[in-house]
Amino acid sequence: MINKSTPILHVEAVEPGLKFWTERFGFQTTIQVPEGDHVGFAALDNGTVELMYQTYEGMKNAGPLAEAAAHGPSFIFMEVSDIQTIKKALEQTQIVQDIHETFYGAQEIVAKEPGGHYVIFSQLPAQPNH
């Protein structure tokens, strides 16, 4: 019934988000739609995770969705295999919460991506073999 879920992050400018994900985490830009002299919409993919970015300007004619998009930021939860590698990739990025253990046993670090959205990188605890 439901095949896929992809967050759309609304931002003032798409380009900083593209640079963040492609340079730090190896994502590929799969779609770019121009909006005047800049990118108005883009999709990124790393083979497992897909993200989309759209400018607030591009949302201005979207009726009630335009107002909702302006209320952000979004929170994105990303499961990772090595939290220390993620921390290194986040150098020169605003860290909101450094590596910590959660109540469910995960090791997490929270950062703000260039558009102001929160990204929670989580290394979940190993599952016992049964």
Task: List each language-model region with its residue ranges.
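Major-groove DNA-recognition helix of helix-turn-helix-type DNA-binding domains
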Residues: 25
